[in-house]
Swiss-Prot record:
Probably part of the ABC transporter SkfEF involved in the export of the bacteriocin SKF. Probably responsible for the translocation of bacteriocin SkfA across the membrane. InterPro entries: SkfF. Induction: By Spo0A and PhoP, during nutrient starvation, especially phosphate starvation. Repressed by AbrB during normal growth when nutrients are plentiful, in association with the transcriptional repressor Abh. Keywords: Antibiotic biosynthesis, Bacteriocin biosynthesis, Cell membrane, Membrane, Transmembrane, Transmembrane helix. It is a multi-pass membrane protein. Residues 23-29, 81-85, 135-141, 209-247, 319-341, 383-404 are extracellular. It is found in: Cell membrane. It comes from Bacillus subtilis (strain 168). This is Putative bacteriocin-SkfA transport system permease protein SkfF. The chain crosses the membrane at residues 4-22, 30-50, 60-80, 86-104, 114-134, 142-160, 190-208, 248-268, 298-318, 342-360, 364-382, 405-423, 427-447.
Length: 447
């Protein structure tokens, strides 16, 4: 945990120094569109994820305590806002000190961070209110309708304002309002003060209303029952011989080495709507980037790959290993690891191939092989981080995992860069990556 806190702290300081320090040169209209988009994303996160206690032990405590449920919600909200605000303010102080030491200038990042803390507060309160609303059916329908309405209006305005380069009537007024949100970093007009106060008021009213509903606690009980059943399946379903079952899509069940994928499919079924929306939105973003802003494609793809890489600790392989299913279910360990990693990451390579095809680049076969080499390198780092950590720490603690992860990433990156300097040929680099990764997998198989 200290390692993760240090990583977040260093990242926050870097963001403050490299990005927030230049806030006076920002295009405030673009900042307004970004802030509005983030607000809509927060609404989606609140609708599709639970920010409230969801473990059975927590639910039992909630039913047995004399404390009102609204106080529990406010406590969770207070903790979420406090640690993020402290991280941001302290990183701003260190950023100011760093800039003064390096350049002698005083930019006052601390003063600017107050604005971000206020935006954090509004976003977190709204996120908690939406998460509370999802536990009550009628409120959930209202918020889903609000989310779809905001997403639709935002998409239409974005298309008309940036792609058609003109808008008229009500769309122009809405686009001007969205662009004006970015002015909070400069001057705060009374209109946006009223809007922000309105969002906070609606959020607290939603929290107060839903926390008094019995349906909210019942929904949390169902959530806790699901995770309790999920854990029981993980710990209690490691039988070598299993009878064929029928899956929820009507085909024969997964047996043998594929049996542990039942748990992944169970989670996929639970969040089917979220995954569908995620796929549609990601496809839409890539369509816009490829055909309208192709120069941004590599940055977008790099950010997605980086997010998947850095979140590898929460992937299926670590989760199954910690629960025991990776070792209890039938099949060779290395086969189960490879199958599980492929099912969790192969979509990245498919997305890369489809995107490259639509971008109409020359010599597609070369770029497919190039992408395959990078994908194998990507897989190798994840496999090394897991196996090295599992060998030294059977509990797979987060700090130990990321130490192995960054060690593999750094050493392999240095080796690849040296090879690139010596050969000056990216094709040679890809071949080396493929052969080296294949050799590593073979050595692990016959170790």
């Amino acid at each position: 945990m200290p390692f993760l806190i240090m990583l977040l702290f260093v990242g926050a300081i870097g963001f403050q120094v490299s990005f927030v320090s230049r806030s006076t040169t920002w295009d405030m209209s673009i900042a307004g569109w970004v802030l509005t988009g983030v607000f809509i994303l927060y609404t989606a996160f609140g609708l599709f994820s639970n920010r409230l206690p969801s473990q059975m032990a927590d639910i039992i405590w909630l039913y047995g305590t004399a404390t009102s449920f609204s106080k529990v919600v406010y406590s969770v909200l207070f903790f979420s806002v406090t640690w993020k605000a402290l991280l941001w303010i302290i990183s701003a102080i260190f950023g100011d000190v760093l800039i003064v030491l390096l350049s002698g200038d005083h930019i006052n990042l601390l003063g600017r961070s107050i604005i971000f803390v206020g935006l954090f507060f509004i976003a977190e309160v709204w996120l908690m209110s939406v998460s509370c609303a999802r536990t009550v059916k009628k409120m959930k329908r209202v918020y889903v309708l609000v989310f779809l309405l905001m997403l639709g209006i935002y998409s239409i305005c974005l298309y008309r304002f940036f792609f058609l380069q003109h808008s008229s009537g009500i769309w122009e007024s809405i686009a001007r309002f969205i662009s004006g949100v970015g002015l909070v970093f400069d001057t705060l007009s009374p209109l946006y003060v009223v809007v922000f106060i309105g969002i906070i008021t609606v959020s607290f009213m939603t929290i107060a209303f839903t926390s008094r509903q019995v349906e909210m606690k019942e929904s949390l009980v169902k959530e806790a029952e699901f995770w309790e059943e999920f854990q029981e399946r993980q710990f209690g379903s490691g039988q070598i011989i299993q009878k064929p079952k029928t899956t929820w899509w009507g085909l024969q069940g997964l047996n043998g080495i594929w049996s542990f994928l039942w748990l992944e499919l169970l989670l996929f079924k639970k969040y089917l709507f979220f995954h569908s929306i995620h796929t549609v939105m990601l496809s839409g973003v890539f369509y816009v980037v490829i055909f309208m802003y192709p120069e941004w494609f590599y940055l977008l793809f790099f950010l997605i790959v980086s997010a998947v890489m850095l979140s590898s600790y929460y992937s299926g392989i670590v989760r199954h290993s910690q629960s025991g299913t990776l070792h209890l279910f039938p099949g060779a360990l290395w086969k189960k690891i490879i199958i599980l990693e492929l099912t969790n990451t192969v979509w990245l390579y498919i997305l890369y191939c489809v995107s490259i095809t639509f971008m109409a680049v020359g010599n597609l076969v070369y770029w497919y092989i190039y992408g395959l080499g990078i994908y194998i390198w990507f897989m190798t780092i994840r496999l090394f981080a897991f196996t090295h950590t599992n060998r030294n720490d059977i509990k797979l603690s987060l700090p130990q995992y990321y130490k192995s992860f960054f060690m593999a990433l750094g050493l392999s990156g240095i080796c690849l860069y040296v090879i690139h300097l010596l050969t000056a040929d990216w094709y040679t680099l890809v071949v080396v990556v493929c052969i080296g990764s294949l050799s590593w997998c073979l050595f692990y198989r016959f170790r």
